[in-house]
């Protein structure tokens, strides 16, 4: 065949099309209903009934609304569930807006420091371009939220509720990123003009003052102390006066953040299993907790998740939720749409190839709250989403085990349940993790939004 497409080639393809046994039926279905509806597999819907052999009751799902804070909502959900049970507070939520304020403030400083560190590079350098493309955003990682809580604590949602700019974050992100790009360019000029470190840092502090003002006007000034006043599910009155956010976390949440680690399943050639990885420029708190991922085989990850569920603890996880999913029905399944049968085309790719080619990446974090074990094997998983109660089964989704294999990339595991060889692998690699490039798909959850 010639390099260019010619009329003979097109005629050949048209002849093949006209001789295809299902062309007319398939084209009518797809053109009238759309590709996904025309290829939907009803049997998959039947198979994914919301019944599970292991299940943790976690109450009403939260709602991130028009924001990219899934990672934050899901992480705070894992922390609020034990609190709800212990203190008899069925509908209690931790303040996502509080952590959002400090996350954006810290990300701004993180951006400034990375701009200063790369000031000797050309603006066209890919890493510099990457930094300026999205100075800050809604996305993030488990370790990044832990860094915020370790530094600033946490408060109840009733003390620091959502605001318009938290629930619909596009205007705030646009405003902040405009300011950060302008100031970032100025910091580069100061460094390249030979200004001293003290002079550069002094100017950066003035810039951060502007950032703080933008955030305070948009989302409110976070409290330093507050009264935790509530009635429990038995209508008993309680009040805890003048408590700080860090005191509140220690007293009412108390999760051992340092003992919960991120594991990933990234079966690409550049990421050997049982090694610890980090992603360049991925973080928020300067001098705080570093993002680290221990790479596991998918069956190792599943076994640990099931063990954690059996211990009564839910699991934060990262996935590619837009793939093979139906939001309204709350289903995640690789056979949900049979596009291969509709078009008579092979779309199959390995998980590694999907990651290497950009076909798949982490774009959403949720919480695993249950699993159905049949004949010793997981068949489907119960998922707590953060899209409110309308989609799925009152906000909960059902994920097939094959979808887990294909599109689940990360899970946060209590280190206590790791076997000794994996504990050793993590401990040996955590202080000097292998650095991945900033645009690696294992960092996509933080940079996608």
UniProtKB/Swiss-Prot annotation:
Organism placement in taxonomy: Bacteria, Bacillati, Bacillota, Bacilli, Lactobacillales
Catalyzed reactions: Inactivates bleomycin B2 (a cytotoxic glycometallopeptide) by hydrolysis of a carboxyamide bond of beta-aminoalanine, but also shows general aminopeptidase activity. The specificity varies somewhat with source, but amino acid arylamides of Met, Leu and Ala are preferred
One GO BP: proteolysis
Residues of the active site: 70, 364, 385
Assembly and oligomerization: Homohexamer.
Localization annotation: Cytoplasm
Species the sequence originates in: Lactobacillus helveticus (Lactobacillus suntoryeus)
Domain of life: Bacteria
Protein name: Aminopeptidase C
Keyword list, A-Z: Aminopeptidase, Cytoplasm, Hydrolase, Protease, Thiol protease
């Amino acid at each position: 065949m010639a390099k260019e497409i010619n009329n003979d080639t097109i005629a050949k393809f048209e002849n093949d099309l006209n001789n295809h046994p299902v062309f007319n039926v398939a084209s009518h279905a797809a053109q009238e209903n759309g590709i996904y509806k025309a290829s939907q597999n009803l049997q998959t819907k039947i198979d994914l009934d919301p019944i599970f052999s292991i299940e943790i009751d976690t109450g009403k799902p939260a709602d991130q609304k028009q924001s990219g804070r899934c990672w934050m909502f899901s992480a705070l959900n894992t922390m609020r569930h034990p609190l709800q049970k212990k203190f008899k507070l069925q509908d209690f939520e931790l303040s996502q807006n509080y952590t959002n304020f400090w996350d954006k403030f810290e990300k701004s400083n993180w951006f400034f420091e990375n701009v200063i560190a790369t000031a000797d590079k050309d603006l066209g350098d890919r890493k510099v371009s990457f930094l300026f493309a999205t100075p800050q955003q809604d996305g993030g990682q488990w370790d990044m939220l832990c860094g915020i809580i370790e530094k600033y604590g946490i408060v109840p949602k009733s003390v620091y509720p959502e605001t318009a700019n938290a629930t619909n974050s596009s205007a705030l992100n646009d405003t902040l990123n405009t300011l950060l790009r302008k100031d970032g360019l100025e910091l580069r000029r100061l460094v390249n003009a030979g200004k001293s470190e003290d002079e550069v840092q002094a100017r950066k502090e003035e810039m951060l003052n502007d950032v703080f003002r933008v955030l305070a006007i948009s989302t409110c000034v976070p409290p330093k102390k507050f009264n935790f006043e509530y009635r429990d599910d038995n209508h008993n009155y309680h009040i805890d006066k003048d408590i700080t956010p860090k005191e509140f976390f220690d007293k009412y949440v108390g999760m051992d953040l340092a003992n919960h680690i991120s594991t990933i399943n990234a079966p690409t050639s550049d990421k050997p299993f049982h090694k610890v990885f980090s992603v360049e420029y991925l973080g928020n708190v300067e001098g705080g907790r570093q993002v680290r991922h221990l790479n596991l085989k998918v069956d190792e990850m599943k076994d640990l998740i099931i063990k954690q569920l059996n211990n009564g603890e839910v699991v934060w996880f990262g996935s590619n939720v837009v793939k093979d999913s139906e939001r309204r029905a709350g289903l995640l399944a690789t056979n949900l749409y049979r596009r291969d049968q509709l078009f008579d085309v092979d779309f199959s790719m390995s998980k590694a190839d999907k990651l290497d080619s950009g076909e798949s990446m982490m774009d959403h974090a949720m919480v695993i709250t249950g699993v159905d074990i049949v004949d010793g094997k997981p068949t489907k998983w119960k998922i707590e989403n953060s899209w409110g109660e309308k989609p799925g089964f009152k906000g909960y989704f059902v994920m097939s085990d094959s979808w887990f294999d294909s599109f689940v990339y990360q899970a946060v595991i209590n280190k206590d349940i790791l076997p000794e060889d994996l504990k050793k692998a993590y401990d040996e690699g955590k202080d000097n993790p292998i650095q991945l490039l900033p645009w690696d798909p294992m960092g996509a959850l933080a940079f996608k939004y």
